[in-house]
Amino acid sequence: MIEALLKKMIKVGDLTIHMPNGSVVKAGDGAGPPVTMRVTAKGLRRLVTNPSLGLGEAYMDSDLTIEQGTLWDLLEIVGKSGGRTPKRGSALKRARKAFKRTVQSVNDRIASRRNVAHHYDVSNALYERFLDTDMQYSCAYFARPDMTLEEAQVAKKAHIGAKLNITPGMKVLDIGSGWGGLSMTLAADPGAKMTGVTLSTEQLALATERAAKAGLSDQVEFRLTDYRDLDETFDRIVSVGMLEHVGAPNFRTYFETVKRLLTDDGSAVIHAIGRMSGPGATNAFTQKYIFPGGYIPGLSEIVKAVEAAGLWITDIEILRLHYADTLREWRTRFLADPDIPTMFDARFLR
């Protein structure tokens, strides 16, 4: 019965599974690079009862080991078996998904700080080892295919700066300012008066230190502040890689706050990850281990929230393939760094 279920779950690829009882299950259509994995009894229970969470947890705990191929090969098989064509589903399924989306993303101020700390306060030293030298933790802009990650992140900041159309002396708010690289760039040229807000104590400390070393303390101020608590206005607002932490129930509040904080002739550039299809729910593994409270929005959700807030959309740009290249660079650097394995235990690294 379990073997039949596994074969039903895996529709494509070439997957061989060594079962706890010694039997071997072949699944998929045989196409692509072969992958062989071995599961313990505990790992098998996890896979069958809750695949979206169980696959990752089984791998982390070594209840699932890969003997041929790579983890990325396995994930490709699993992803393709899940299908790429959006299915609308029944009204009940859509209602369940909407309920799950809401419950997962109730991000009040306390929850927001806790969720940000879970991901960003792990260790600045970790991020320094696989990000670019400016510590840009968001999609780079590969204007040319031969660009290095450093060059692509410089191009990303220039691309955003061009969209913002800042003139010297403008007050600019950076929502989710991270380690401060974008704020410092816009302060240096074209000379904006930057305010960056973050909920991460680790990011705040390093960003403040970096601004001081660069001689930009008079041009850039970083605050440990929830964006919803700001009460001043700005000529421009930029937010890169932060909307994913807002949560679907708070999209309208987010854009209403953006409108409230902008001057009458102000404008904002919001840069975020977007899901391929319409509204959905966050993967269980991502929700538990990577971005608690996070939710990747569908474009339709963003447009609706922007319009409801009374803002005008003047430009939409899709950078999906640029993020694929960015993630590839991060993964390569993470795996190649000799110090990272000494900083964390095997479960964290897996």
Each model region followed by its residue ranges:
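Feature captures hydrophobic
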Residues: 1-153, 159
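Conserved SAM-binding loop of SAM-dependent methyltransferases across substrates and taxa
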Residues: 179-190
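Conserved class I S-adenosyl-L-methionine
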Residues: 168-176
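Conserved SAM-binding loop
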Residues: 207-208
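Substrate-binding/catalytic lobe of Class I Rossmann-like enzymes that use SAM or dcSAM, i.e.
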Residues: 273-350
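A short glycine-rich, Lys/Arg-flanked "PGG" loop and its adjoining helix->strand segment in the class I
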Residues: 252-264
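Conserved beta-strand signature within the Rossmann-like core of class I S-adenosyl-L-methionine
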Residues: 265-273
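A short acidic, Gly/Pro-enriched loop at the edge of an enzyme's catalytic core
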Residues: 228-237
